[in-house]
Amino acid sequence: MKLFDLSGKKAIVTGASRETGLCYAQAQALHEAGAEVVLLGGSEKNLEHMRQVTGGPESGYHVVSGDLTDKSSREEGFARALECLGGRVDILLNGAGTQFRCPAAEFPAEKWAHVLDINLSAMFYMCQLAGRVMLEQGSGKIINIASMNSFLGGHIVAAYAASKGGVVQLTRALSNEWMPCGIQVNAIAPGFMETELSHDMMISQTGKEITARIPARRWGKPEDLKGVTVFLASAASDYLSGAVIPVDGGYLGK
């Protein structure tokens, strides 16, 4: 369907350095819809693996290193990504994130700073870098990854909840500025998702209790994010901006 066709579009995706992760599934969705995709950031070991998995530039993927929390590394990585895409970026998907669990009274200052740096500050700076290009183009799509903890406080995840709440407000603030310029800024809030990192929790007693509360009666899978990702990256969402879309199996409706 032409409305969802991304042929010729140029995309940068952060947080997709793991083959089994959510953001790689989203990067795949963009690629399958026709976009040329840069995977930006992550450890060099993971990125080298992703180069092998994706097949490299010949197959429409580029893999670029860069520490998103370091200004010079982030800017150099973005510049390389932009060069790979011929100087244009139509889609930015901000998926890089981290988590740290600790009671608030004992939360280490350096861990608080680290979580906020990756989940919120780096996201803003990536939006800023891509936004400058998109403003010159007069068009663009930015997709930020929020969380259930954008709406729910969670338990012993103060920094994560604060950062993901910030993602929602950042998305709205940028939408207010940039929608009049032809740039749509939206967010996806994944629910409880089945990944390599969450598997042990999913099969625990707590995980079973969570499953019982999800109307879909299962945890989400990375591929459950593919459809909404293509929608938000395509012309189908041209009149949608500042929105936060939960993909949670109905969890928030309970």
Predicted regions and their residues:
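Alpha-helical segment proximal to the catalytic Tyr-Lys
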Residues: 132, 176-180, 238
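Residue(s) in the substrate-gating loop at a strand-loop-helix junction
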Residues: 147
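Active-site loop immediately N-terminal to the catalytic Tyr-X3-Lys motif
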Residues: 105, 152-158, 180, 217, ...
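Substrate-binding pocket helix/loop in short-chain dehydrogenase/reductase
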Residues: 103-104, 111-116, 142, 198, ...
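Canonical Rossmann dinucleotide-binding motif of NAD(H)/NADP(H)-dependent dehydrogenases/reductases
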Residues: 5-38
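Active-site helix of classical SDR
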Residues: 127, 163, 171
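Short C-terminal tail/terminal secondary-structure segment
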Residues: 2, 152, 208, 212-213, ...
